[in-house]
UniProtKB/Swiss-Prot annotation:
Residues 25-210 are cytoplasmic. CDD domains: PLDc_vPLD6_like (cd09171). The keyword Ligase does not apply. Presents phospholipase and nuclease activities, depending on the different physiological conditions. Plays a key role in mitochondrial fusion and fission via its phospholipase activity. In its phospholipase role, it uses the mitochondrial lipid cardiolipin as substrate to generate phosphatidate (PA or 1,2-diacyl-sn-glycero-3-phosphate), a second messenger signaling lipid. Production of PA facilitates Mitofusin-mediated fusion, whereas the cleavage of PA by the Lipin family of phosphatases produces diacylgycerol (DAG) which promotes mitochondrial fission. Residues 1-5 are mitochondrial intermembrane. This is Mitochondrial cardiolipin hydrolase. It catalyses: a cardiolipin + H2O = a 1,2-diacyl-sn-glycero-3-phospho-(1'-sn-glycerol) + a 1,2-diacyl-sn-glycero-3-phosphate + H(+). The active site is at 143, 145, 150. It comes from Xenopus laevis (African clawed frog). Residues 138-165 form the PLD phosphodiesterase domain. It is found in: Mitochondrion outer membrane.
Length: 210
């Protein structure tokens, strides 16, 4: 019986070692994620990305685009999505965040206080749906434009999340899973998330200075 137990233990350890070796081989073979998206892009149908189970017969072109690839990256989130963006008025991107929120993916948004109430802003609807949103409380702009997916992928560049940015402006987004870069952006998000905690807001700064 003792010999049988030792044999089972040895077999288990051998299996674990083999699994780890296969995992490490896979990681070595896996190509790093390095993609750059450029805008503007033509208007195309994004329903196959947002609602893959539904058939769409709209007249828009059903082709791949930088915008659809951006949506694919965001909707690939399994655990978390951290978004830091200056202005957010794209209904399609708001819809993507709500899809993630309903999947119980933790979605957190940081934005600029001067622009979050602008006409067409999606911040109000996101908050109403239960998405966690925080904003700055300073005279300077919260001008970041980046997202961190599952703590493993970062999307960053010049792009604001507006229809004009996607369809009219010359913009770019870099997508990478470089560990050093992702950690830096994750750290910056967490720093701002704590800094913009509503519990620490000073709503009467003029009284404090007297």
């Amino acid at each position: 019986m003792l010999l049988w137990g030792r044999w089972k233990l040895a077999a288990g350890l051998a299996g674990l070692a083999l699994s780890l070796e296969l995992f490490y081989r896979y990681m070595r073979r896996r190509k790093p994620l390095r993609e750059v998206l450029f805008f503007p892009v033509p208007v195309t149908c994004i329903e196959p990305v947002l609602s893959p189970m539904k058939q769409c017969s709209c007249p828009l072109p059903h082709t791949d685009s930088a915008f659809s690839r951006l949506l694919v990256q965001l909707l690939g989130a399994q655990r978390s999505l951290e978004l830091c963006v200056f202005t957010f008025s794209s209904p399609s991107l708001a819809r993507a965040l709500l899809i993630l929120h309903r999947r119980d993916v933790r979605v957190r948004v940081i934005t600029d206080n001067d622009y979050m109430a602008a006409p067409g802003s999606q911040i109000g609807p996101l908050r109403s749906a239960g998405v966690a949103v925080r904003h700055d409380q300073s005279s300077g702009y919260m001008h970041h434009k980046f997202a961190v997916v599952d703590g493993t992928v970062v999307l960053t560049g010049s792009l604001n999340w507006t229809v004009q940015a996607f369809q009219s402006n010359k913009e770019n987004i870099l997508i990478t899973d470089d560990t050093v870069i992702v950690k830096a952006y994750q750290k910056e998000f967490e720093r701002l998330w704590e800094e913009y905690d509503p519990a620490t807001y000073n709503f009467f700064p003029e009284k404090e200075n007297k």
